[in-house]
Design a protein with these regions (language model features):
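A glycine-biased, small/acidic residue-tolerant capping/turn segment at secondary-structure junctions
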Residues: 166-169, 173
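Short flanking/linker segments adjacent to small metal-binding domains or redox-active Cys/His motifs
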Residues: 160, 203-226
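C-terminal accessory region of radical SAM enzymes
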Residues: 52-86, 108, 114-164, 187, ...
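Sequence contexts marking disulfide-bonded cysteines in secreted/extracellular proteins
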Residues: 91-93, 167, 183-185
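Radical SAM enzyme [4Fe-4S]-AdoMet core and its adjacent flexible, acidic
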Residues: 1-110, 114-125
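A generic structural signal for well-ordered coil/turn residues at beta-strand boundaries
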Residues: 97, 149-152, 180
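Residues that line or immediately flank small-molecule/substrate-binding pockets and catalytic motifs
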Residues: 35, 160, 169
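Short microdomains enriched in Cys/His and/or Lys/Arg
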Residues: 173-196
Length: 226
């Protein structure tokens, strides 16, 4: 099957019907219409990229209308909205170190693709076996289970669903990788998320930062300034 993935931002969300029509013309089987996740360069440009709540509602309604006209034919459309507007965090990577292991070009083994922004040391497959990394490495074990969780996660009856949310997102927004993901309405830092979403659609405070090969800014440096 052919799978297409489209990255949705505030700049192109109004074209979502055209995107679906193009997907049908290309005979795609599955199409993910996913709002960009705010890590790396998307985080750096978040004020430009984050759609408003109304834009997301309008886009989802357009997707549902298109689905209704398909009569069971054509691509399967999957609409993914950003968790910034949710009251509970996503179960990032299905829980830290439970399902995924990412190997980067330099051989670093990571529990998730963004984990290198965290103040942790990660192993390398050039030096250790995958079996040893998965079962014994400190970084992979660090956020497994719930013993690391702060309040309110520790006593929450939903902790086995969302695992405290995204460690990278908690770190980016609060500077503390142990904190409850600010997406959660129970988080003492939830006001940070509301402050971000309330600004969506307003004039950004700075220009878009484009990543160029000849003038590349490492993501770690960008994150360190936050």
């Amino acid at each position: 099957p052919m799978v297409l993935n489209f990255c949705i931002t505030a700049q192109n969300i109004h074209e979502i019907e055209d995107v679906m029509a193009l997907s049908e013309q290309l005979n795609a089987d599955f199409v993910e219409l996913a709002t960009v996740q705010y890590y790396g360069w998307a985080y750096e440009n978040r004020d430009h990229l984050l759609p408003t709540s109304q834009q997301l509602q309008d886009a989802e309604a357009a997707v549902n209308r298109y689905r209704a006209q398909q009569n069971g034919k054509g691509p399967t459309f999957i609409f993914v909205s950003p968790d910034y507007y949710e009251s509970r965090p996503k179960a990032c990577m299905n829980g830290w170190g439970t399902t995924f292991l990412t190997v980067t070009p330099d051989g670093s083994a990571l529990p998730c693709h963004s984990a290198k922004i965290l103040p942790l040391s990660f192993p390398n497959v050039k030096e250790r076996s995958l079996h040893d990394i998965w079962h014994q490495d400190f970084s992979f074990n660090h956020f497994r289970g719930d013993s690391w969780m702060p309040s309110p996660c520790r006593d929450c009856d939903e902790k086995d669903k969302d695992f405290g949310g995204c460690r990278c997102q908690a770190y980016l927004l609060t500077g503390d990788m142990y904190k409850t993901d600010p997406v959660c309405s129970k988080s003492p830092d939830h006001h940070l998320m509301k402050g971000i979403t309330d600004k969506a659609g307003t004039a950004p405070s700075k220009a878009l930062a484009y990543r160029k090969v000849e003038k590349s800014i490492p993501i770690l440096e960008v994150s360190a300034t936050r």
